[in-house]
């Protein structure tokens, strides 16, 4: 597993500035987020040990892609976001 670099941290901080403080954070039982999550009332979700679910995607971009293109969403009657988006576009 690769180590976090300064540019990774800066990217996360920019995204928090743009989108706001997250409601939940999934971690690998590390202590880096403990103080911040307590202060900001962020739900701390711990990844299961040895199952490495937090590494499944390899990057934030992969998680966002999965969420937007593959994951079925209950609010869309179990359709994917991209299908719901394309279906609502007016015909050419």
Swiss-Prot record:
<dbReference type="GO" id="GO:0003676">
    <property type="term" value="F:nucleic acid binding"/>
</dbReference>
<protein>
    <recommendedName>
        <fullName>Uncharacterized protein AF_1071</fullName>
    </recommendedName>
</protein>
<dbReference type="InterPro" id="IPR036397">
    <property type="entry name" value="RNaseH_sf"/>
</dbReference>
């Amino acid at each position: 597993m690769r180590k976090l670099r300064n540019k990774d941290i800066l990217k996360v901080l920019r995204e928090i500035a743009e989108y706001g403080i997250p409601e939940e954070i999934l971690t690998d039982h590390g202590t880096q987020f403990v103080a911040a999550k307590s202060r900001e009332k962020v739900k701390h979700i711990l990844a299961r040990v040895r199952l490495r679910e937090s590494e499944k995607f390899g990057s934030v971009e992969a998680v966002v892609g999965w969420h937007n293109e593959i994951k079925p969403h209950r609010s869309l009657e179990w359709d994917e976001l991209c299908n719901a988006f394309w279906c609502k576009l007016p015909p050419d």
